[in-house]
């Protein structure tokens, strides 16, 4: 058996590509074997068929490429190829033979215009029309690739969203199942007599709770810190309310003392004199007299305010008045905190019911105490009366 390409087959293919007319004519070879017009590929002949004289010599390489291009064109069946057919090889051996156009490399991926360019030397040997066609095809391939990338990106984003939603659903279902299993197991817990087993079980339950809380979605636990924040703020304000109230009270007391210093006083001295050590101690009688002086009638205050002495008051005098009022306030606080001396003196004196005399505790403790020195109240009164008459 001899595998040879049929010359009539090549002529029929070239005739069908060059003209859009009907099928090629069917003739018989010299050997008597009919050449079928619908057959493709190689013809299997038992005997070697002679080549006709009229047909030009065609190489095997051109035959294989033309049969491959013809089959690919029939598979695609695109309208662009029928309207604008690409240049094909001519049958005449004497005419110029143009190179074939490259086929799409990624046709299986849905890319119709992604062609592989030939070498630079081959492109330079082509005409300007062919070069422009290559350029247009390459631009269309780039646009097609960009569209494909945008479609793939949209598909990727959609897949990521679906994956995130599916994860949330799975986490919720797992949380429900774990919580249901935990409640069921807690109802039917075995009461073991060994405390070690109980401790191990409690630690396992704690670890399960921690894993569930960490695996759960963070969106569920967002409102929890919002609820805890008001509690912490309320505790903070409750702790600060006491010192703030104390400061406010002290401020109000200072303000009252400052207002008292602005009210005209009874003393006629324009320049305040420095206070002695005796005056620094404020007794209840002095504080009462000071309050009585403050509560003066309106006529007296108006007359005092209209006096030129008050009008010509210096800032230094005001400062001294304010300082004196503050010192008086400090003395009042000290008096309220310390016990009065009169009560201590009263506690030291004792009253004798037998003779009606008062005896001091210090004198009783003294060793030189004599009972004759004590006098009764009637004798003391009579002696005082006699002294008054003599005078």
Curated annotation (Swiss-Prot):
Segment Disordered: which positions?
A: 1-107, 181-235, 265-318, 338-391
Q: List the disulfide bonds.
A: none
Compositional bias per record (Basic and acidic residues), positions renumbered to this chain: 338-351
UniProt-annotated location(s) = Cytoplasm
Q: Where is the composition biased (Polar residues)?
A: 182-194, 265-286, 354-367
Q: Biased composition, Basic residues: where in the chain?
A: 59-77
Q: Which family does it belong to?
A: Belongs to the TDA11 family.
Q: Which GO terms describe its cellular component?
A: cytoplasm
Q: What is this protein called?
A: Topoisomerase I damage affected protein 11
Record's keyword terms, sorted:
Cytoplasm
**Residue spans with biased composition (Low complexity)?**
14-31, 48-58, 302-312
């Amino acid at each position: 058996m001899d595998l040879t390409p049929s010359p009539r087959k090549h002529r029929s293919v070239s005739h069908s590509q060059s003209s859009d007319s009907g099928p090629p004519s069917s003739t018989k070879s010299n050997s008597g074997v009919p050449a079928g017009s619908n057959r493709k590929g190689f013809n299997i002949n038992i005997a070697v068929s002679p080549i006709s004289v009229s047909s030009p010599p065609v190489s095997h390489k051109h035959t294989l490429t033309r049969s491959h291009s013809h089959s690919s064109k029939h598979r695609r069946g695109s309208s662009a190829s029928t309207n604008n057919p690409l240049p094909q090889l001519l049958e005449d051996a004497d005419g110029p033979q143009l190179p074939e156009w490259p086929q799409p490399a990624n046709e299986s991926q849905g890319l119709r215009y992604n062609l592989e360019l030939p070498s630079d030397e081959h492109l330079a040997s082509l005409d300007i029309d062919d070069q422009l066609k290559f350029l247009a095809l390459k631009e269309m391939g780039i646009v097609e690739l960009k569209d494909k990338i945008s479609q793939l990106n949209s598909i990727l984003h959609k897949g990521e969203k679906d994956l995130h939603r599916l994860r949330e659903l799975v986490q919720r279902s797992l949380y429900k199942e774990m919580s249901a299993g935990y409640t069921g197991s807690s109802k039917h817990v075995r009461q073991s007599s060994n405390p070690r087993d109980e401790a191990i079980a409690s630690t396992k339950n704690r670890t399960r709770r921690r894993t569930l809380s960490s695996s759960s979605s963070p969106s569920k636990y967002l409102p929890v810190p919002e609820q805890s924040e008001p509690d912490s703020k309320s505790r903070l304000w409750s702790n600060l309310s006491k010192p703030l109230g104390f400061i406010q009270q002290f401020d109000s007391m200072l303000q009252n003392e400052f207002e008292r210093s602005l009210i005209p006083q009874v003393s006629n001295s324009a320049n305040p004199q420095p206070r002695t050590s005796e005056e620094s101690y404020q007794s209840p009688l002095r504080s009462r007299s000071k309050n009585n002086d403050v509560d003066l009638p309106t006529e007296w205050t108006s007359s005092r305010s209209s006096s030129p002495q008050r009008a010509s008051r210096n800032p230094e005098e005001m400062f001294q008045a304010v300082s004196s009022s503050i010192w008086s306030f400090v003395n009042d606080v000290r008096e309220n905190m310390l016990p009065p001396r009169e009560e201590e003196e009263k506690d030291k004196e004792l009253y004798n019911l037998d003779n009606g005399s008062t005896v001091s505790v210090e004198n009783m403790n003294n060793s030189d105490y004599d009972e004759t020195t004590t006098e009764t109240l009637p004798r003391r009164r009579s002696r005082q009366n006699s002294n008054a008459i003599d005078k």
